[in-house]
């Protein structure tokens, strides 16, 4: 991953965390890693454990951030959620997986928009 992509990703994750806190979420951890992958943000929304995938883009040339959640990524997110819940003995706790889509200006690196989609893998 290039340094520019890393920077854009970091900007997106920081903006997402700040946005979620403004919405009343309590951030538990950022960049939770386990053998099968990484969860960008884990937070609490009242009594619900929320695992949040952050997708950051500087343009829509390769699709929107939401469109970047492939079937394989969805399967991995489900496995990551199960792994986290089991590791922390939270299997009986309500849980959902959300997406925070962040658009960043390519030149200034300023956040242009944030879109929060709750329960992206429901249904």
Where would I find each of the regions flagged by the language model?
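Hydrophobic "anchor" residues on beta-strands that sit immediately upstream
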Residues: 26, 49, 94
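Short acidic/glycine-enriched loop/turn segments that link adjacent beta-strands
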Residues: 35-37
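Conserved catalytic cores of phosphodiester-cleaving nucleases, focusing on short active-site segments
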Residues: 39-60, 71, 77
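Short, solvent-exposed loop/turn elements at beta->coil junctions and helix N-caps
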Residues: 30-33, 102-103
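Mid-chain, well-packed structural core segment of small domains
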Residues: 62-95
């Amino acid at each position: 991953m290039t340094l520019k992509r890393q920077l854009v990703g970091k900007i997106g994750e920081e903006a997402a965390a700040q946005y979620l806190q403004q919405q009343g979420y309590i951030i538990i951890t950022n960049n939770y890693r386990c053998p099968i992958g990484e969860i960008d943000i884990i937070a609490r929304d009242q009594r619900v454990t929320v695992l949040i995938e952050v997708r950051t883009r500087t343009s829509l040339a390769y699709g929107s951030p939401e469109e970047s959640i492939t079937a394989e990524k969805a399967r991995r997110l489900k496995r990551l959620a199960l792994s986290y819940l089991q590791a922390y003995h939270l299997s009986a706790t309500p849980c959902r997986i959300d997406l925070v889509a962040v658009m960043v200006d390519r030149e200034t690196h300023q956040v242009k928009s944030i879109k929060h989609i709750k329960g992206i893998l429901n249904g």
